[in-house]
Amino acid sequence: MATAQRVTLNDGTTTWTVIDRSFGLVEPVEAYLEYGRQIDFRPNTTRAYAQSLAQWWSFLEVTGTSWDAVKLHDFGDFISALRYGEQDSPIRELRPRPTLSDSTVNLRMRAVMSFYRYQAEDRKSVV
């Protein structure tokens, strides 16, 4: 399971990154968060995006999906998992209750979409 990790830099400032279930740095996410730091993401934005992307990365790990091979239905499954919890439960409610507020789900999706926009632009500039 990926997690957002607070990091204290040499100059004493605090920032956030994402580590995977093997405690390794998630390089594509770190590149995006570093870009955010360079364009002056506020510290709370960096933290919120790191937490959101850690949830996304955990979802990808559980589903065995590579971050650069996602399909549209993967985003739908992620949104559903955020709203209603685990999808693999043998017990299904007829009317599941949301586990996160709409604004939190929207924040998570905003972070994920921003991450993919960054990746698309970054790849364009390299090619």
Regions found by a protein language model. Give the residues of each.
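N-terminal DNA-binding module of tyrosine recombinases/phage integrases
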Residues: 2-39
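N-terminal core-binding DNA-recognition domain of tyrosine recombinases/integrases
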Residues: 30-44, 54-127
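A generic short-segment signal for beta-strand/edge and adjacent turn/coil regions
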Residues: 17, 44-46
